[in-house]
Every structure is written in C-alpha cells, then in structure tokens.
UniProtKB/Swiss-Prot annotation:
Residues 158-169 have a biased composition (Polar residues). This is Uncharacterized protein YJR115W. Residues 144-169 are annotated as: Disordered. PANTHER family: PROTEIN ECM13 (PTHR36826:SF1). InterPro entries: Ecm13-like. Residues 144-157 have a biased composition (Low complexity).
Length: 169
C-alpha cells in the first residue's frame, strides 16, 4: 500500500477546554513517513516539526478493558506490529461504516471532528514551516554569500532538497 514506508506514527492529542483547563476529548492522528518527510493527507512535511510530539499507541475507549493500559505498552513498535495495528484499525473502521445502528451519525461527527483538527494542525505546521524558513534565511545570509559560488546550493531551498513523492494508493 505505501511504498518505501519506514514508520507509522500515531499521535494522540488532547483538546483543552479553555474555561475549565481540563481535557475534554482526545483526537488520534496517523502520520506515515518515508526517510525524513511525513505524508499527511498527501502533503509532505519535514520530520523536524514532529520531534516534539509524544508518540504512543492508544486503544479505543470502547475496547479499553480488553487491552493493557497505555502505560504498560511500549512506545516503540516494530514495523510488522505497526502494520498489524493499522490493519486492525482499518478493519474496525470498515465494520463501523457497514453497520446500521443509531450511533452511526455520532461516529461520522467524530471523524469530521478529527479531520477538522488535522486541518488546524496542518495550518499550524505551515506557519511553523514559514517561520523556520525565514529564520534559516536570516541566519544563513552571511553564509549564503560564501556558498553562492556553487550553483547547486543557490538553486534549492533546504526544505525542497529531499522531497520525493510517495504513493498513497
């Protein structure tokens, strides 16, 4: 399915209620990366922005009794374990999509909420990306004059050097 995929990151973010300063609900996001880029919904992003993410593999709340608690699970999984975990998630989502029950609208609302949260995160990453490029340009202005003699360094930016397309289908 994913060519040259090395690791799958699952990032669990908690949404904060600004009035009571308590965690109201949790969103789970799946990032797939090859080498040093991350593909999120077809967009390639640099991995340096994901170093601050705390990675762990949450179980669904409805199945919390059948899985060990998150604190006992290892934050690092082997690639076969990751693919097995992702295939189980996909099969459960497929089963939920095919079942006809009164909670289906609620599940669709959750999925739309996750997509909206991911869009907000991507917007924040774009802002961080533009700030890093500006900082790199400001820091490298004195060194750029020394490297301007080489044609390869003047043609490419640091973020586009290693971008290579990956197949999502």
């Amino acid at each position: 399915m994913f060519t040259n995929t090395r690791t799958i990151l699952i990032y669990n973010s908690k949404v904060m209620n600004t009035h009571t300063h308590t965690h109201t609900h949790t969103h789970t996001h799946i990032y797939i990366y090859t080498g040093d880029q991350v593909s999120v919904r077809g967009r390639l992003l640099s991995l340096k922005f994901f170093k601050v993410l705390k990675l762990f593999f949450p179980s669904p709340t409805s199945l919390a009794t059948s899985h060990p608690p998150l604190s006992s699970m290892s934050p690092y999984m082997t690639i076969p374990q990751q693919y097995l975990y992702i295939s189980k998630i996909r099969s459960k989502l497929s089963q939920c999509a095919l079942t006809r029950h009164h909670h289906r609208e609620l599940d669709l609302r959750k999925m739309v909420g996750h997509a909206n949260m991911l869009d907000r995160i991507l917007d924040e990453i774009d802002e961080i990306d533009s700030e890093v490029v500006l900082c790199d340009a400001a820091d490298g202005s004195s060194t750029a004059e020394a490297h301007s003699a080489s044609p390869a360094s003047s043609d490419s930016s640091p973020l586009t050097n290693n971008i290579r397309p990956i197949s999502i289908m």
